[in-house]
């Protein structure tokens, strides 16, 4: 999950705070989405890089489509 409050904020599948592409904004509906999860070997070096990139922005995705500590 990536969060950069400057241009866009992807807070999971239902939240895009920055509205970088407003035409692609998800509309709420009663339809349910199915998520298929798989199993793959652990890639420790990739995960460490992803985590360090997330903390470099200084914000994490919070509630109500906001990034903490900054609002998107």
UniProtKB/Swiss-Prot annotation:
Tissue expression from the record: Expressed in leaves of mature plants.
InterPro entries per the UniProt record, alphabetical: Metalthion_15p
Transmembrane region(s): none
Keyword entries, A-Z: Metal-binding, Metal-thiolate cluster
Pfam families: Metallothio_2
Coiled coil: none
Cystines in this chain: none
A GO term, aspect molecular function: zinc ion binding
Cited function: Metallothioneins have a high content of cysteine residues that bind various heavy metals. Functions as a metal chelator of nickel (Ni), cadmium (Cd), zinc (Zn) and copper (Cu). Possesses higher affinity for Ni and Cd ions compared to Zn and Cu ions.
Family: Belongs to the metallothionein superfamily. Type 15 family.
Protein name: Metallothionein-like protein 1B
Organism of derivation: Oryza sativa subsp. japonica
Native organism taxonomy: Eukaryota, Viridiplantae, Streptophyta, Embryophyta, Tracheophyta
Name of the gene: MT1B
């Amino acid at each position: 999950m990536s969060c950069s409050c400057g241009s866009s904020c992807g807070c999971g599948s239902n939240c895009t705070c920055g509205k970088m592409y407003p035409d692609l904004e998800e509309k709420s509906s009663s339809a349910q989405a199915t998520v298929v999860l798989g199993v793959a070997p652990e890639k420790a070096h990739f995960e460490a890089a992803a985590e360090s990139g997330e903390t470099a922005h200084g914000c994490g995705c919070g509630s109500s489509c906001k990034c903490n500590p900054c609002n998107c």
